[in-house]
Amino acid sequence: MIVSAQQNPDVFTALRGRVTHAAPLAPQTWFRVGGQAETLFRPADTDDLCTLQRRVSNLVPMTIIGAASNLIIRDGGLPGITVKLGRGFNEITTDGDGMIAGAAALDATVAEHAAQAGLAGLEFLCGIPGTIGGAIAMNAGAYGSDIASVLDWVELALDGDIARLEASRLSLSYRHAALPPGCAVVRARLRTRPGNTADIIARMQDIRAARDAAQPVRARTGGSTFRNPDGQKAWELIDAAGCRGLSRGGAQVSEKHCNFLLNTGEATAADLEALGEEIRQRVQASCGTTLHWEIKRIGIPFHHPECQS
């Protein structure tokens, strides 16, 4: 049985973060689609988040979001409590031969801080949208590196306590991290190596230029839609299946990069998800390969029979 957070208003008593009931979530996502959060909570800091975790029954769903850059929130919204990490979780500090970053710190901002400190190895982060928390949750990677190659440890809020886990305990693999169910990443330490600031910045400029040339970075999109199958590139399979420019409602496959879905202005989450499923079906029919979603899809569907997990 799922219990509504509003059935127990005392859950939020004396918490310092902001509480909003029936909060629209579309403005919080890069796709600009999705329904409402039954209750949206922006914790002031880690203590605020842990207090909430201790108070909330397991019967109340709790969803953690950050920048929501690689996420589709379905049109029926999110039940229970949606926790959005922001201020209070975005501190970035230099720590010897590494960087410690809060979960809400933007990947690109962490890369920039490392560059200014003369620390190399995190340049790839400037080409990844979203936050450090999300990057860890999916072992994000690009341009020859990934989180698994630089993560030292991660601190998690779980059941109201903070636990520090070494990277070796997360079973990091391609776009996967074995995080404990119900946890929230709060901060992490990333390894670096000494480097020349000018060289690091030049490398980041090259990455940004390559990204701008190949991806629809100024569109309403959610990053790579599907994981690359072993030894193959998803975009090539999608293109070969005739899906470049394919549309469904207000959703469209990018003409610039076939592994990106776009909200052309009036898309719903159902449009995007249905288009993704059509791509999967066409690729399967074309070459026999099953594409798996990289974009995370959460929430309550809005009566769209073609949207399947």
Curated annotation (Swiss-Prot):
<feature type="active site">
    <location>
        <position position="294"/>
    </location>
</feature>
<keyword id="KW-0132">Cell division</keyword>
<dbReference type="GO" id="GO:0071949">
    <property type="term" value="F:FAD binding"/>
</dbReference>
<keyword id="KW-0274">FAD</keyword>
<dbReference type="GO" id="GO:0071555">
    <property type="term" value="P:cell wall organization"/>
</dbReference>
<comment type="pathway">
    <text>Cell wall biogenesis; peptidoglycan biosynthesis.</text>
</comment>
<dbReference type="InterPro" id="IPR036635">
    <property type="entry name" value="MurB_C_sf"/>
</dbReference>
<keyword id="KW-0133">Cell shape</keyword>
<keyword id="KW-0521">NADP</keyword>
<dbReference type="InterPro" id="IPR016169">
    <property type="entry name" value="FAD-bd_PCMH_sub2"/>
</dbReference>
<keyword id="KW-0285">Flavoprotein</keyword>
<protein>
    <recommendedName>
        <fullName>UDP-N-acetylenolpyruvoylglucosamine reductase</fullName>
        <ecNumber>1.3.1.98</ecNumber>
    </recommendedName>
</protein>
<keyword id="KW-0131">Cell cycle</keyword>
<dbReference type="Pfam" id="PF01565">
    <property type="entry name" value="FAD_binding_4"/>
</dbReference>
<feature type="active site">
    <location>
        <position position="175"/>
    </location>
</feature>
<dbReference type="GO" id="GO:0051301">
    <property type="term" value="P:cell division"/>
</dbReference>
<dbReference type="GO" id="GO:0008360">
    <property type="term" value="P:regulation of cell shape"/>
</dbReference>
<dbReference type="InterPro" id="IPR006094">
    <property type="entry name" value="Oxid_FAD_bind_N"/>
</dbReference>
<comment type="function">
    <text>Cell wall formation.</text>
</comment>
<dbReference type="InterPro" id="IPR016167">
    <property type="entry name" value="FAD-bd_PCMH_sub1"/>
</dbReference>
<feature type="active site" description="Proton donor">
    <location>
        <position position="224"/>
    </location>
</feature>
<feature type="domain" description="FAD-binding PCMH-type">
    <location>
        <begin position="33"/>
        <end position="195"/>
    </location>
</feature>
<keyword id="KW-0963">Cytoplasm</keyword>
<dbReference type="InterPro" id="IPR016166">
    <property type="entry name" value="FAD-bd_PCMH"/>
</dbReference>
<keyword id="KW-0573">Peptidoglycan synthesis</keyword>
<dbReference type="GO" id="GO:0008762">
    <property type="term" value="F:UDP-N-acetylmuramate dehydrogenase activity"/>
</dbReference>
<dbReference type="InterPro" id="IPR011601">
    <property type="entry name" value="MurB_C"/>
</dbReference>
<dbReference type="InterPro" id="IPR003170">
    <property type="entry name" value="MurB"/>
</dbReference>
<dbReference type="GO" id="GO:0005829">
    <property type="term" value="C:cytosol"/>
</dbReference>
<keyword id="KW-0961">Cell wall biogenesis/degradation</keyword>
<comment type="similarity">
    <text>Belongs to the MurB family.</text>
</comment>
<dbReference type="Pfam" id="PF02873">
    <property type="entry name" value="MurB_C"/>
</dbReference>
<dbReference type="InterPro" id="IPR036318">
    <property type="entry name" value="FAD-bd_PCMH-like_sf"/>
</dbReference>
<keyword id="KW-0560">Oxidoreductase</keyword>
<dbReference type="GO" id="GO:0009252">
    <property type="term" value="P:peptidoglycan biosynthetic process"/>
</dbReference>
